[in-house]
């Protein structure tokens, strides 16, 4: 189960924005976040049409999952033989992880659209309409 499934779309959006604002401090970071919020479908787009994240908010959920996994890997790898639970990433490392993970699929904004599709219902054998991404 991912963050979106556990907490809902609005909470996932807030979580993304909190991570972004807390960790990304480069020039124009605020403009980037504003662009994502106001001019793209980043927070509602799917991450694919058929595979993981092929649902509303899938791109957001995928980006958050990548962030949390990458951060855990970075802490584990950088901690070495130390207790990973005690290791803290530097501000620069936190920023790097946030940028890489949260924005790695930003090129997918505006790529998918919801359309009516047709499929054969396996239970009834009848063709039916459904909403799917293309």
Language-model regions: role of each:
Residues 49, 55, 75-79, 84-134:
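Divalent metal-dependent catalytic cores for phosphoryl transfer on phosphate-bearing substrates
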Residues 66:
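Divalent metal-coordination and catalytic microenvironments
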Residues 26-29, 56-60, 93-96:
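Amphipathic, non-membrane alpha-helical segments in soluble helical-bundle scaffolds
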Residues 1-45, 49:
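Non-catalytic interface/linker regions that flank or bridge core catalytic/transmembrane domains
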Residues 38-62, 133-134:
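Active-site flanking loop/helix segments enriched in acidic
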């Amino acid at each position: 189960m991912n963050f979106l499934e556990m907490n809902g779309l609005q909470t996932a959006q807030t979580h993304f924005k909190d991570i972004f604002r807390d960790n990304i401090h480069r020039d124009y970071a605020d403009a980037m976040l504003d662009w994502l919020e106001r001019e793209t479908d980043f927070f509602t787009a799917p991450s694919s049409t058929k595979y993981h994240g092929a649902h509303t908010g899938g791109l957001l959920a995928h980006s958050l999952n990548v962030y949390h996994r990458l951060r855990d890997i970075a802490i584990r790898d950088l901690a070495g033989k130390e207790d990973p639970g005690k290791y803290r990433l530097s501000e620069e490392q936190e920023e790097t992880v946030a940028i890489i993970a949260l924005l790695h699929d930003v090129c997918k904004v505006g790529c998918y659209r919801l359309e009516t599709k047709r499929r054969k219902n396996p239970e009834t054998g009848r063709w039916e309409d459904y909403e799917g991404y293309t």
